[in-house]
């Protein structure tokens, strides 16, 4: 789902140069890139706005060897049979016969045994306490990140810091609320029981049931029960962001079996990852929201069940989270070694440039840099040279999705695919990478970049079998030649590409008249590029100037994050930046990205307005693929259709995170597939004392 597409969008687009929806474990759903756009982690989310640069995207991890059984659970047999685990409770009539386990994965086999003591990538002895201060940009006016209205405070959902491309690890739900399952940073689309003690999936996938931990509590001491889970599901589907309705459509009904068991009944053919999606939904306190209108912005700190509570705030300016010493789950295997900071504080700044200066001054402790130019030229200051600030390129092995200039096909100007293709031909990535991004990026060539799901070469026979039913509606070139993008020498001499773009525009019914590109009625082609932060202007203006050479009038408009969110929520734009974040195994987020239902749902991530029979059919094929081979085939076929329909102008990507921090912290030595998870870090008292003293002395 999209817990704030605007920020997601930004993150994406900015990834390379200069936007939760939470998804299945490590899927990287919400959600973006180099200089940046709107995916898949709240509305104006802090770090998200900190800059989208052409550069980043992570994904999940490798599962241990074993039979690829869709939905297989940790501790269960491949057939998922067996009785309830000790203390799990008894299944009532109608939901018996399912294997019981402590974790679940979409494809493959979970790595950890039922009695695992803690995640292998954490430091189980990490000290607790200390403070970390982070930066957010823009402002906020709500503590409800699950609805369209209002701009939510950062830190309520998703990780503490947003990574480029909307990817990253650490709290799929967040730190105030918790979910039934906790995803593993080190496995692909795999999560383990947290609020639940065991999970059961019917052999025929007709239901998924969660047996709850009887000790689960909200921060005010109220017990967390199955009724809270059921109420949350119904409320999110009814009043939450459109993505919830889309992703949860495969549930036919929800029932509670006693106080500690919740059963989700699934429709035939439901999304393969739906059990995981359900397990990663937040669980909200039914009693606390009673009498409150859930569809309205929330101005008071909510009650949660997570490791942190909101201890103080200045609405729109700052918010502080304090670790709850009585947190009920602090000794669970899924919690040990995580959530180590005693206090996490967010200070809000006008934009990314101001936030960077605050970091240099020592007012902010850690920063994820999404602007390539800034990373190359803006981190040469005394604290870096003295070793007080550490600057690191951290590699990840995650799918990076797609980032680009997305075109709103609801607008007449972009309804014609020939026009959209011409926009792609006119974009000189090589010049931008050389002159704007310091050569730090590579071209985005797939909606599943940095993943085996990316389409390459010509369609293989198994892909053709999926594509053939839609052949009449697809470009012939899709079947005849590999997808390519223009490549220049990077010197700005792109006349051949502009000639080709002009030829496409002429085929679309335009012609040049008095140095203007006009249609048959003599109207000049004109449109606006909408941006959420002035940081992105430096990547938009050169593109706009190139388009003016074709006689197109392009206006670059910058609005504040809240207005950007509103405009994109209601699809009131021509072109903007967008990042589609993906994971190793696509989940129901792709329906929110590209389905017909999402095209007409206010606030969805389907900014282009895609409603195409081939896309619709291939989304279904991806979501119902029974094994990795068929998943790969379906995803590659879908990738080809999206590329050849030219819904966006591909920008850039990278497999590194640019992160700088004041040398106050410790972190596990083990490298993560996701690259970076701040939840596993801690304040190192010795380092912090030295660095803080140097900062006070003006270091």
Tell me the role of every PLM-derived stretch.
Residues 136-138, 314-319, 323, 424-485, ...:
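Detector for C-terminal structural segments
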Residues 96-203, 234, 301-303:
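N-terminal lobe/hinge region of extracytoplasmic solute-binding protein
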Residues 28, 33, 116, 315, ...:
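Ligand/substrate-recognition segments at binding pockets and active sites
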Residues 209, 213, 296, 329-379, ...:
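Ligand-site clamp/hinge motif
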Residues 122, 126-127, 147-165, 198-242, ...:
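Aromatic- and charge-enriched surface segment that lines or borders ligand/interaction sites
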């Amino acid at each position: 789902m999209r817990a704030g597409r605007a920020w997601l969008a930004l993150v994406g687009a900015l990834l390379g140069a200069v936007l939760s929806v939470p998804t299945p474990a490590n899927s990287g759903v919400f959600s973006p890139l180099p200089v940046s756009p709107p995916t898949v982690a709240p509305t104006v989310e802090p770090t998200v706005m900190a800059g989208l640069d052409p550069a980043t995207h992570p994904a999940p991890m490798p599962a241990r060897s074993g039979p690829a059984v869709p939905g297989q659970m940790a501790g269960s047999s491949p057939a998922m049979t067996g009785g309830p685990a000790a203390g799990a409770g008894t299944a009532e009539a109608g939901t018996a016969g399912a294997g019981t386990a402590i974790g679940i994965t979409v494809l493959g086999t979970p790595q950890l045994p039922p009695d695992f003591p803690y995640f292998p990538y954490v430091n189980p002895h990490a000290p607790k306490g200390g403070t970390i201060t982070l930066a957010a940009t823009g402002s906020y006016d709500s503590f409800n990140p699950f609805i369209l209205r209002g701009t939510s405070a950062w830190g309520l959902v998703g990780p503490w810091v947003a990574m480029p491309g909307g990817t990253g690890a650490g709290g799929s739900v967040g730190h105030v609320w918790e979910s039934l399952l906790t995803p593993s940073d080190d496995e692909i689309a795999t999560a383990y029981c947290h609020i639940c003690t065991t999970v059961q999936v019917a052999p025929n996938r007709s239901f998924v049931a969660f047996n709850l931990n009887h000790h689960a509590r909200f921060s005010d001491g109220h017990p967390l029960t199955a009724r809270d889970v059921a109420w949350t599901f119904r409320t999110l589907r009814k009043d939450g962001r459109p993505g919830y309705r889309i992703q949860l459509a495969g549930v036919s009904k929800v029932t509670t079996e006693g106080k500690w068991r919740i059963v989700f009944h699934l429709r035939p053919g439901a999304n393969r990852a739906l059990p995981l999606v359900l397990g990663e939904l937040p669980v909200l306190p039914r009693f606390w929201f009673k009498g409150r209108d859930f569809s309205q912005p929330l101005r008071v700190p909510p009650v949660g069940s997570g490791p942190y509570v909101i201890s103080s705030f200045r609405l729109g300016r700052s918010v502080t989270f304090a670790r709850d010493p009585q947190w009920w789950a602090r000794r669970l295997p899924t919690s040990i070694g995580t959530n180590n900071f005693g206090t996490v504080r967010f200070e809000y700044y006008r934009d990314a440039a101001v936030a960077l200066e605050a970091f240099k001054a020592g007012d902010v402790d850690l920063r994820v840099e999404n602007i390539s130019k800034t990373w190359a030229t803006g981190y040469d200051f005394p604290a870096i040279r003295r070793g007080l600030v550490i600057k690191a390129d951290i590699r990840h092995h995650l799918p990076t999705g797609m980032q680009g200039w997305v075109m709103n096909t609801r607008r007449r100007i972009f309804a014609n695919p020939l026009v959209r293709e011409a926009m792609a031909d006119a974009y000189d990535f090589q010049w931008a990478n050389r002159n704007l991004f310091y050569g730090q990026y590579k071209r985005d060539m797939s909606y599943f970049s940095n993943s085996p799901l990316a389409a390459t070469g010509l369609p293989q026979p198994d892909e053709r079998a999926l594509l053939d039913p839609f052949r009449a509606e697809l470009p012939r070139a899709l079947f005849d030649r590999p997808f390519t993008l223009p490549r220049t020498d990077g010197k700005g001499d792109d006349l051949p590409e502009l000639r080709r773009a002009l030829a496409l525009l002429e085929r679309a019914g335009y012609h040049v008249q008095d140095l203007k590109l006009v249609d048959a009625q003599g109207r000049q082609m004109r449109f606006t590029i909408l941006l959420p932060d002035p940081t992105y202007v430096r990547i938009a203006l050169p593109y706009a100037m190139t388009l003016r050479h074709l006689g197109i009038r392009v206006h670059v408009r910058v609005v504040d994050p809240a207005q950007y969110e509103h405009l994109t929520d209601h699809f009131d734009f021509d072109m903007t930046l967008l990042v589609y974040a993906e994971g190793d195994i696509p989940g129901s987020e792709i329906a929110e990205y590209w389905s017909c239902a999402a095209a007409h749902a206010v606030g969805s991530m389907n900014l282009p307005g895609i409603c195409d029979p081939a896309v619709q059919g291939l989304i279904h094929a991806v979501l119902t693929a029974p094994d990795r081979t068929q998943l790969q085939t379906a995803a590659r076929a879908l990738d080809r259709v999206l590329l050849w329909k030219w819904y966006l102008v591909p920008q850039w990507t990278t497999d590194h995170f640019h992160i700088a921090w004041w040398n106050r912290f410790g972190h596990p030595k083990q490298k993560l597939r996701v690259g970076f998870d701040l939840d596993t870090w801690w304040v190192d008292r010795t380092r912090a004392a030295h660095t803080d003293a140097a900062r006070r002395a003006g270091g």
